[in-house]
Amino acid sequence: VAVPWKLLSRKGYQVVFSTENGHRAYCDPKMITGVIFGQLGAQKEAIGFYRELEQDHRFLHPIRYAAIDPAVFDALVLPGGHAAGMKQYLENKVLQEKTVQFFKLNKLVCSICHGSIVLARSIDPATGKTVVHDKKMTGLTKFLERIAYYLTSWKLGKYYRTYPAYVQDEVKTCLADKNNFNTGGNQFKPYVCVDENLVTARWPKDAYLFAETIISKLEHTKH
């Protein structure tokens, strides 16, 4: 959340936040302090961006999902995360309906990490299929999700397993061609998958490239 917000704000874009009930969201504390022994958390610069974000009026006073009007926004950005509190966001039917509307209006739609689950669960009632059925995309890969789990399960249990199924597996089940889920090759090199107006990324390592790609797409639509 913090990196795209910071880079978009620098470019003069107004970033509006939204939550289920219009209450402010909070970063998982472990991402600030470090998941284990002060490690595996967010990078120092990203933490600084989050501290700035905590002073942003629109972040502190988000609109409800039901109040989102896709017609007045240029893009929808679906962030990631893995803590148990994410389920409220990942399973929200209103947000899924709004996501379908963004697609129908041919707006820019972007997701990173677990945000891809929202896309996978957003069903277009006109087709009965997910909005990304015919798309090429990425999301948190099984490789990365497994590494995070195996490194931390001895202390944190299933902290890194939001659901029994891996993100990659759930997303692939909704795609017309399972090969359309792109892992991006080198998992530790920034990667973003772009398919027309869909921009997707895998994990925090991709956040800067993800934000820069969103900006590039928005700038292109101006001309």
Enumerate the language-model features and the residues they cover.
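Extended, subdomain-level signal for the structured scaffold at the beginning of enzyme domains
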Residues: 1-105, 118-223
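Conserved, well-structured core segments that form or line functional sites
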Residues: 109
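Catalytic nucleophile serine of serine hydrolases
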Residues: 113-115
